[in-house]
A protein has these predicted regions:
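Conserved cytochrome P450 K-helix E-x-x-R motif and the immediately C-terminal K′/meander segment
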Residues: 1-7, 178, 263, 271-312, ...
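Conserved cytochrome P450 K-helix/beta-meander segment immediately N-terminal to the heme-binding cysteine loop
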Residues: 324-351
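Cytochrome P450 heme-thiolate monooxygenase catalytic core
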Residues: 41-46, 80-231, 267, 271
Length: 420
């Protein structure tokens, strides 16, 4: 794909037999996502892979999406995330405490379980331990099947989800529905975004979403939070194992940090917001920024023009599919020196800017990830919990490859833990 698109700011490609304009110029991508976003709706090329409803934050309608984004924002902004840190740390500690020296672990499954536990506690608040464990197991299974779901090709073209994906979705949704029903009967016991969904109503007092739609919205939030975190953390731990010098520097930074490693938070294509008001991000955070540059979980995106637009030198009629890849944007040799190498120190002098989309691991604009601040803190905590306690190596004989499915994830990454 890189060879095909190199030197073409906009080029026509075919996806499943449908023509689309593929944009590689970061300034033009920024125009699509931010400046001219009102002229673009969500694309349909990859909708085949979706099994969730289009209510709430998945709404195709921009006004509806903005409404639910406003509902979610108070519970995911930086100040609110701080309140979730103790639970994040507890779940991270419990996850790594279950590992045994020398016994190979599926690192993506382990990170998925940790992320699912964090997501559940954030959305639902306190749950009975048995219920929480069951939800966590079902969510981890569903998230794994979602990760493996193709975005295009024959497997994605089918209108029916795979048997395993359908089974995982049905089982998790049924259990989740019972929890939502309990919260509907006692909405004051709900937490976070779920409480906002339960009490949201139109001007006539009628609930905006049905119980089923609330359940689907919860499924979407939980799976999105789980699959992306699991993928990013898997790559982070793999890269640490592959580069002892980077690992040593991360450990040194963590040793100097009493709590989470936040020294700055990369904004979705809009610059780096310093977490402490001054100075560059610390090495551990620069490492996470580099992981997200190399392996953004949402690696490809599609939009569709709602009206005729001019994009660079191209005039696009209404109904045109417009695609871009954060993976390719993040590896642009014109922006990044030696773009395929993991070099956290590049972020000492290089900062994401608001002028283009050369670094957008969480997207940008009105449909950028609403949980970005939450995700950064979660990644920091998980990285610290693992790296401080364990040294991981890739199991001998393993061949790790990137799988570009719903997320960009390592294909079956087995790692062997040894205590520090």
């Amino acid at each position: 794909m890189e060879r095909l698109l190199r030197g073409h700011p906009v080029r026509t490609v075919s996806v499943d037999g449908v023509a689309a304009e593929f944009v590689t110029d970061p300034a033009l991508v920024r125009r699509v996502l931010v400046k001219d976003d009102r002229h673009y709706g969500k694309g349909e090329l990859f909708q085949k892979a979706r099994i969730l409803s289009r209510a709430g934050l998945l709404a195709q309608d921009d006004a509806l999406h903005r409404h639910y984004r406003r509902l979610a924002h108070p519970y995911l902004r930086t100040a609110a995330v701080t309140g979730h840190v103790p639970v994040m740390e507890e779940i991270a500690r419990d996850t790594v405490a279950s590992w045994r020296p020398g016994q190979p672990i599926d690192i993506q499954a382990q990170m998925g379980r940790a992320a699912s536990g964090i997501a559940l506690s954030t959305l639902f608040g306190a749950l009975p331990r048995e219920t929480s464990d069951m939800l966590g197991e079902h969510l981890a299974a569903l998230s794994w099947e979602m990760i493996r779901k193709p975005l295009y090709g024959n497997a994605a073209r089918s209108q029916q989800p795979t048997r395993r994906l359908a089974g995982a979705f049905t089982g998790f949704r049924a259990l989740l529905a019972s929890c939502v029903a309990g919260r509907l009967n006692s909405p004051d016991t709900a937490a976070g975004y779920l409480s906002a969904l339960l009490t949201d109503a139109g001007r006539d007092g009628t609930p905006s979403l049905s119980a089923g739609q609330i359940c689907d919205e919860a499924v979407m939030m939980l799976t999105a939070a789980t699959v992306t975190t699991a993928s990013v953390m898997s790559w982070a731990l793999y890269l640490l194992a592959e580069d002892p010098l980077v690992e040593e520097k991360v450990l040194k930074d963590l040793a100097q940090t009493a709590g989470p490693v936040t020294g700055g938070v990369a904004g979705g294509g809009g610059g780096v917001r310093s977490g402490h008001g001054q100075g560059p991000p610390g090495y551990a955070l620069r490492f996470l920024m580099e992981v997200l540059r190399l392996y953004p979980p949402v690696w490809i995106t599609c939009r569709k023009t709602l009206s005729g637009v001019t994009l660079g030198e191209h005039v696009l009629p209404a109904g045109t599919h417009v695609m871009f890849s954060s993976y390719l944007l993040h590896r642009d040799p014109g922006r990044y020196r030696d773009p395929h190498r993991c070099d956290p120190d590049r972020w000492l002098s290089l900062r994401p800017t608001a002028q283009d989309a050369s670094y957008i691991p969480f997207g940008a604009g009105a449909r950028g990830c609403v949980g970005e601040a939450f995700a950064w803190r979660e990644l920091e905590i998980l990285l610290g919990a693992v790296a401080r306690e364990w040294r991981l190596t890739v199991r001998p004989g393993s061949r790790v490859r990137a799988a570009a499915h719903t997320t960009l994830h390592p294909q079956r990454l087995l790692m062997v833990p040894q205590p520090r």
